[in-house]
Amino acid sequence: MKIYLATGNKHKKREMTELLPEHEIVIPSDEGIDFDPEETGKTFYENSIIKAKALYDIVHAPVIADDSGICVDAIEGRPGIYSSRYAGPDFPQGRPDGIKITQEEQNKYLISELNKALENPKPDFENFLHGKRSCHYTCAFFLYLGNDRIYAVQETFEG
């Protein structure tokens, strides 16, 4: 079966192809489809379904979509749904010009923001599940087969 993957990320396509070798996994750019839906949701779940529906409306075929990110407890869950656009504490939802920074730069900003937060700890830091540097990774995942056939899962991995 041909399944569209609602992403432009070739790495995700490779991973999904390995997980589902009996299916043809296609990303929009493989077929010249311009696909960049506005992720206006407030949760990973909402953004995932936005992407799934948007691509399904174009291809009218099975679509897999996901949205995921890291949420750091000491900095109020940032970067959260903005993980892929995160550009430091000054631009937690991404740079105004839309330019994305490298993953290495994102990591440096995130560690710097966390370290600053830990310099002035809040009383609830001790209550975090895995200590003051605790975080969790959340992934919402959809298989969209049309308005009446939707399969969804969301998992959180604590750390």
Residue ranges and their predicted role:
Residues 2-4, 11-159:
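Anionic-ligand binding patches
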